[in-house]
Amino acid sequence: MNLILLLVIGFLVFIGTYMILSINLIRIVIGISIYTHAGNLIIMSMGTYGSNKSEPLITGGNQLFVDPLLQAIVLTAIVIGFGMTAFLLVLVYRTYKVTKEDEIEGLRGEDDAK
């Protein structure tokens, strides 16, 4: 299971990097969103797999458990990531409405153009 999770996280980081390096603003926003999902999976994997974790208060039995603190952190990160994605989409939309450009190269000023 660790190998599958590692491959999924690596694939998400690869796709996120590829999308961030594109010149289209929407793809950049989607790439940042994919990065946040990869980060959430990394945090969740820290609490799932480990050595002999058991309940902190119950002494009978050796039931494995998942750390609830990491689940709360990931839930908070999902909400923050959603808000950040919504803000970036509105920013890209407003930039498109003002400049009629949806690519990075078109946003350069006359002084910066080569």
Curated annotation (Swiss-Prot):
GO biological process terms on file: monoatomic ion transport
Where located?
Cell membrane
- Check the record and name the Gene3D superfamilies matching this protein: 1.10.287.3510
One MF term in the entry's GO annotations: antiporter activity
| Record's bilayer topology term | Multi-pass membrane protein
- What transmembrane ranges does the database entry give? 3-23, 28-48, 72-92
Cellular component GO terms, alphabetically?
plasma membrane
Which keywords does this chain's UniProt record carry? Answer: Antiport, Cell membrane, Ion transport, Membrane, Transmembrane, Transmembrane helix, Transport
Entries under InterPro entries matching the protein: CPA3_antiporter_subunitC (IPR050601), NUOK/Mnh_C1-like (IPR039428)
Question: Domain of life, per the record?
Answer: Bacteria
Which Pfam family is an annotated match for this chain, by its short name?
A: Oxidored_q2
- Binding partners and assembly: May form a heterooligomeric complex that consists of seven subunits: mnhA2, mnhB2, mnhC2, mnhD2, mnhE2, mnhF2 and mnhG2.
The UniProt similarity line reads: Belongs to the CPA3 antiporters (TC 2.A.63) subunit C family.
**Protein name, UniProt field:** Putative antiporter subunit mnhC2
- The organism is Staphylococcus aureus (strain MRSA252)
